[in-house]
């Protein structure tokens, strides 16, 4: 049975690429045609790639690999958080901070600081501080929650990065490749398929397209871990 059908992808607008002048020639094998100055993605190729990505992701999850979902653009932010949480993965959905992977020791210290501040807030320790100091601590807490909240359960580097919009997340791509962390990437017609291990050619701007792809990948992770794609948990948060 196909992981995703052609009609589902059509309804999600997964076939719409970018303007032809913005294309990356390396994506030519995934492009069906050009229409009104816009490239149309070959959804038969997308279906094949989705099947491969599902199997690869499921196998990785079954072997205990940990996942990081990355997508900071407005259209993807909410979906990234939702689907990562559903399959127990970590996520970055606001802004990629330099060194999130390559300077992990420093990043982990900031995550630990976030946890400390959350404990202080919940215990009332911040409220007991002088008003000015409490205000400073709460601003720090708010900022850390915004940018690092999706990483609180990530005790070590991820084994796999799932990416929305390769062009936007250039720093995440560079850091993952530097550390030999494989990438499962949604690739629009302006992307480079050579920069990922598991390509999924599709529209990475439409919310429904992002929902469709990330939803299936989250299903694959849950199936690999639990034998069902309905399981919800926080497996990446467990040692």
Curated annotation (Swiss-Prot):
One term of GO molecular function: structural constituent of ribosome
Keyword annotations of the record: Ribonucleoprotein, Ribosomal protein
Gene Ontology CC annotation, any one: cytosolic small ribosomal subunit
Superkingdom of the organism of origin: Bacteria
Key word Ribosomal protein present: yes
GO BP term (any one): translation
UniProt cross-references to PANTHER family, sorted A to Z: 30S RIBOSOMAL PROTEIN S2 PROKARYOTIC AND ORGANELLAR, SMALL RIBOSOMAL SUBUNIT PROTEIN US2M
Similarity comment: Belongs to the universal ribosomal protein uS2 family.
Record-given protein name: Small ribosomal subunit protein uS2
């Amino acid at each position: 049975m196909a992981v995703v059908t052609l009609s589902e992808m059509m309804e999600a607008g997964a076939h719409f690429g970018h303007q032809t002048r913005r294309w990356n020639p390396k994506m030519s094998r995934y492009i069906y045609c050009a229409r009104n100055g816009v490239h149309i993605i070959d959804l038969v190729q997308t279906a094949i790639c989705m099947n491969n990505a599902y199997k690869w992701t499921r196998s990785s999850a079954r072997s205990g690999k940990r996942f990081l979902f990355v997508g900071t653009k407005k259209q993807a932010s909410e979906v990234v958080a939702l689907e990562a949480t559903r399959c127990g993965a970590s996520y970055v959905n606001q802004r990629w901070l330099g060194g999130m992977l390559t300077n992990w020791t420093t990043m982990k210290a900031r995550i630990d600081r976030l946890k400390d501040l959350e404990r202080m807030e919940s215990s009332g320790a911040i409220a007991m501080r002088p008003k000015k100091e409490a205000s400073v601590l709460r601003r720090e807490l708010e900022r850390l929650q915004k940018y690092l909240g999706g990483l609180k359960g990530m005790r070590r580097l991820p084994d796999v990065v799932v990416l929305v919009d390769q062009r936007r997340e250039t720093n995440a791509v560079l850091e993952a490749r530097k550390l030999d962390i494989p990438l499962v990437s949604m690739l629009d017609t302006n992307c480079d398929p050579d920069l990922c291990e598991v390509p999924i050619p599709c529209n990475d701007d439409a919310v429904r397209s992002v929902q469709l792809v990330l939803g299936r990948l989250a299903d694959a992770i849950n199936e690999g871990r639990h034998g069902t794609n309905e399981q919800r948990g926080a497996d990446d948060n467990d040692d």
